[in-house]
Amino acid sequence: MFGVTLAELSASLGDPVLALGLAAFALLLLAIPISFWMVSGGSNSAVVTLLVALANLVLTAQLVLRWWQSGHFPISNLYESLCFLAWACTLAQLLVERSLSSPIVSAAATPMALLCVAFASFALPETLQEASPLVPALRSSWLVMHVSVIMCSYAALLVGSFLSMAVLFTDRQQTLELRSSSIGTGGFRQAKLATSAIDQNDGLRLSSINLSRTEQLDSLSYRTITVGFLLLTLGLISGAVWANEAWGSWWSWDPKETWALICWMVYAAYLHTRFSRGWSGRRPALVAVAGIVVIVVCYIGVNLLGIGLHSYGWFFEA
């Protein structure tokens, strides 16, 4: 799928938009091994943050240039939407790192943006990478409102879900019990260690370093997913209004609409377990990780099928 000939790579370098995409790919590719090295060494993640910030600036320049070339908001085909999603993921990562500057955050979040840029640059055929005129139905101000909000919601949900995945790796044999809301300061929590690790004389032992890091990741994932869920809700509502204006129907059970609703329900279940049932740690993290699969099916799977109003086209046939 990712086979790219030397001639195709040379042609990409000749197109400034595609060249900027390759530059962002190189920066993110460099950031990932450094972030994992910093996780193992416990070093500061400033270098990775700088690389991700540079990648975000490059992607910004790419989107602005494509906007200027095409004359419309650059989110009308699969290549543009993938680059926009990568831009939103890097922005979400930078915002999260303002709350917790940790190499674990970089190691968890950076691969998502890299995969988006890699898929856009190396997997898609040239016909799906080129700018094309908008079809009449997309020539609406709702394009920017609806699609950009949906893409930003995916970015926040994916970054939050990958942080939840990091919770699964850092929460070694510990179960976090929520004593107050994770939103804000995080409240008070305690750790129940595995039975084999409990000293009957000492009772409950607390590992302050591991617990603190896991707590922070757990709280950050909760807050990030909450923001993503609100954006997804806004995106679905704006999409329904747009659909009613364009086709006279609020909801048509298009494959993308159906999977977007499933995605909304998965993350609604995640927030319900956190807010109403008081879950934290591993159990809600597993729900968030399941959400990653649903987003991939909703965003990429529908396009592979090439059916429905939201499909960018079946790129295997391009």
From Swiss-Prot:
Record-annotated membrane-spanning stretches: 17-37, 45-65, 75-95, 104-124, 149-169, 224-244, 258-275, 287-307
GO biological-process terms attached to the record: cytochrome complex assembly
Alphabetized InterPro entries for the sequence: Cyt_c_assembly, Cyt_c_biogenesis_CcmC, Cyt_c_biogenesis_CcsA, Cyt_c_biogenesis_CcsA/CcmC
UniProt entry keywords in alphabetical sequence: Cytochrome c-type biogenesis, Membrane, Thylakoid, Transmembrane, Transmembrane helix
Domain of life the protein comes from: Bacteria
One Gene Ontology cellular component annotation held by this UniProt entry: plasma membrane-derived thylakoid membrane
Main subcellular location of this protein, as a coarse class: membrane
Topology class, membrane: Multi-pass membrane protein
MF (Gene Ontology): heme binding; heme transmembrane transporter activity
Annotated Pfam families: Cytochrom_C_asm
Localization: Cellular thylakoid membrane
Function: Required during biogenesis of c-type cytochromes (cytochrome c6 and cytochrome f) at the step of heme attachment.
Subunit composition and interactions: May interact with ccs1.
Family, as annotated: Belongs to the CcmF/CycK/Ccl1/NrfE/CcsA family.
This protein's name: Cytochrome c biogenesis protein CcsA
Organism (species): Prochlorococcus marinus (strain MIT 9303)
Gene: ccsA
